[in-house]
Each structure stands twice: as structure tokens, then as C-alpha cells.
């Protein structure tokens, strides 16, 4: 259905619309605003899905799409948690216990994209925008449990902002390979407990094809 929507939109906009697919490896670092919740190691995830550029002028586009964004990380709770909410009920996390989160969101970026003219077979671009996200899955490893549902600990909505650069290499006609780097920082608390605020820094290695 999503593919059909993009193709219909492309037919309506003609040369003013570009459709793409991408698979971005992502490195995530969690951040905490309290001293008793400590982020541990970074986590490798991915951002997979569709891109759509609606051109307002030759070198300016409204950039959006829909992707499945896999993220997470490990938090160390130095004071412990008395009522960590998991699928099997409220469980305690001992002092200095760790929880590794594996969270998936549907992400719908909203951005402005600026592009150069064609230079040889290359086009260079920069983009800046926001990233609304809807949680679709949240699992965690804790207390010797693995892949346990922890949806009750993770907020349903999240939001970030991003800035990125990239390049497109023409493969002939309307088809181009693209790659680039993008940084996204979230500013909405990922977890539900009110005593802390967990956000993330993310580095995206952008890879895809534009049609």
C-alpha cells in the first residue's frame, strides 16, 4: 500500500518527485540527565525504508518517507529499580543492574533538502529536519531474561532532529546511487519513568538508490 501511494504520487508530480529505497546502518549512544542512570556501550542498529523528495524548485525539495528504525542501548541503574515494568509483571532491577533496550519505531522524517546542479555524474546535497517516531516494538535484556517485552517502559512517541550531507551518483536516466552521513539527536524522553530523561545521539551511514 505504501509503495502504491508513492508511485501514484510520483505519477502526479512527474519530474517534481523522486522515490527511493534505503538501508542505513546506525550507531546509537544513549544519554541520561541523572547520575544514577548511566549509559553504557553504543549500539548498532538500522534504518530501512522508503524516501520521497517533492521538488519545490530545481535545487530545493521537501524530503520525507517512511522507515523502520531499529535503535536502543544499555543503561546501568546504579540505585536499582523497584518496579521495572516488563511483560511478566513488575520486577526489581538490583543496584548496578543493567537493561539493554531493543526498540523499533516507524519513522516519518520531515526535512528540507538542498542540492547542487549535476557535477559530472555527481550531485551533492544537505538536509535539515525533524523525525517523528511511533514505537512498534520494545524488548529488553535484564536479570538473565532476553528479548522480554518492555513496551510499558518505553514511550509510544519520540521525536528527533537531524542534519546530514550526501552525494548521488547517476547510474543513467533517472536512477542514482546515493550515500552520505547524517546525525540525529532525539529530544523526547524515550522511557516512561519520570525521575530521568533518556535521549539519544545517532550517526546514520546513508546508503540507497533513487529512481
Task: Give the location of each predicted region.
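Membrane-embedded beta-strands of outer-membrane beta-barrel proteins
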Residues: 48-50, 108-112, 126, 163-165, ...
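Gram-negative (and chloroplast) outer-membrane scaffold detector with strong preference
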Residues: 17, 23-27, 53-141, 210-211
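Short glycine/proline- and aromatic-enriched beta-strand/turn motifs that initiate or cap beta-hairpins
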Residues: 13-53, 210
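Outer-membrane beta-barrel translocator domains and adjoining extracellular loop/strand segments
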Residues: 31-37, 74-81, 138-146, 190-196
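Residues that define the transmembrane beta-barrel architecture of outer-membrane proteins
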Residues: 15, 40-46, 102-108, 122, ...
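Predominantly the C-terminal beta-signal and adjacent terminal strand-loop region
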Residues: 71-77, 152, 158-211
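Bacterial N-terminal signal peptides
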Residues: 1-10
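Outer-membrane beta-barrel domain signature
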Residues: 37-39, 97-101, 150-155, 192-196
